[in-house]
């Protein structure tokens, strides 16, 4: 084990820790913000000589010499005993469709077992955690309640609490952290796209949210997870935080991330949000709105194998140049409902799970929103 290594290997670890510290200081010089993953000097001593599992996807990365390095690769190079990876929605490599079932597999690059936490199984079992001492959670969130990584973190925390395992969350800024808006989730509407009584946009980082899960006793039987958050340094939630990578296959840029809390409602309507195009969550339309000039045609592509209205021309709106939002904007949802010919079939059965209650649907139907 690392703590029992000879002096020469201890020196190597010391050098590596300080090398990563230099990288972090360079990041501070660039934008004055240090995120959790960059603070190797804080979390590496907590995991040396321990068996580690990691909950991550493609967003678990940092930049060194203008190159992106994944957390798993970084820790393996530091001789950390990474035993397995738990994968959330979209998979470990982040290239699977929304809602697509993920199966257990072996990562071809590292040879590590990948255990799915999306599909029939959403929570690590006691067997999964056998001989695991610590779990590290590092996934980029976008600050919207229906983004399922929060629910994955909830169940990981619950499993850690049940099996007396420490959880380390490497915190990351929230790109929609500059506002709080939307109805608080009602108990009868809770599901995997919303497990907690919070607004749609909650303004917290994922590390802050993890602390709230513990503090509010939201885990089963009021369990408490042994939680350590590697916090962000020099984070200002009122400043725009631009991601340098897609947090998921259908959020390709900052505009889509900013529009996502306002457009995700359409996922439970007949309206396309551009899945199967290059403008995901930046356009809306259906084949039946022929009075609109703008059009797009969804096609099957990686991350959107069977998009809504596949191969049909959809007419609607291009929202690429909409002003940056600091609130949820319902005007597009209301407009879509007014333009829908078959209003009885506009809202699908799962709409209330996205909205957080059944009231919003009724208000729109009655013209009260």
Task: Enumerate the predicted regions with their spans.
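Bacterial Sec-dependent N-terminal signal peptides
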Residues: 1-32
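Glycine-rich, charge-decorated loop segments at or immediately adjacent to ligand/cofactor-binding or catalytic sites
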Residues: 93-99, 168-190
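Conserved anion/nucleotide-ligand pocket segment
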Residues: 190-262
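Glycine-rich, aromatic-lined ligand/substrate-binding cores of catalytic
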Residues: 233-310
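Conserved functional hotspot residues or short segments at active or partner-binding sites
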Residues: 279-369
């Amino acid at each position: 084990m690392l703590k029992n290594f000879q002096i020469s290997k201890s020196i190597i670890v010391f050098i590596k820790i300080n090398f990563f510290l230099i990288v972090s200081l360079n990041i501070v010089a660039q934008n004055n913000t240090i995120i959790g993953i960059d603070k190797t000097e804080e979390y590496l001593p907590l995991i040396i000589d321990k068996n580690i599992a990691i909950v991550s996807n493609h967003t678990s990365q940092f930049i060194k010499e203008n190159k992106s390095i994944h957390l798993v690769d970084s820790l393996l190079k530091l001789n950390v005993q990474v035993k397995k990876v738990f994968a959330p929605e979209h998979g470990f490599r982040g290239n699977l469709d929304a809602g697509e079932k993920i199966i257990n597999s072996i990562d071809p690059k590292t040879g590590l077992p990948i255990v799915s936490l999306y599909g029939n199984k959403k929570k690590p079992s006691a067997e999964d955690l056998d001989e695991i001492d610590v779990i590290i959670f590092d996934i980029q969130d976008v600050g919207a309640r229906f983004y399922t990584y929060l629910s994955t973190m909830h169940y990981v925390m619950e499993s850690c609490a049940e099996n007396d395992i420490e959880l380390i969350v490497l915190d990351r800024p929230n790109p929609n952290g500059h506002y709080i808006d939307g109805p608080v989730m009602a108990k009868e509407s809770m599901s995997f796209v919303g497990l907690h009584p919070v607004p749609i946009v909650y303004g917290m980082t994922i590390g802050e949210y993890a602390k709230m899960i513990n503090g509010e006793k939201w885990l089963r039987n009021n369990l408490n997870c042994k939680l350590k958050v590697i916090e962000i340094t020099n984070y200002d939630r009122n400043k725009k935080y631009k991601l340098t990578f897609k947090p998921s296959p259908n959020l390709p840029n900052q505009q889509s991330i900013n529009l996502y809390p306002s457009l995700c409602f359409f996922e439970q309507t007949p309206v396309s949000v551009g899945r199967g195009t290059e403008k995901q969550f930046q356009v809306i339309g259906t084949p039946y709105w022929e009075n609109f000039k703008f059009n797009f045609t969804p096609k099957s592509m990686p991350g959107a194998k069977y998009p809504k209205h596949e191969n049909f021309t959809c007419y609607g709106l291009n929202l690429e140049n909409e002003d940056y939002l600091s609130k949820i904007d319902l005007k597009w949802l209301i407009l879509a409902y007014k333009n829908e010919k078959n209003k009885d079939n506009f809202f699908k059965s799962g709409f209330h799970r996205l909205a957080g209650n059944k009231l919003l649907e009724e208000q729109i139907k009655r013209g009260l929103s």
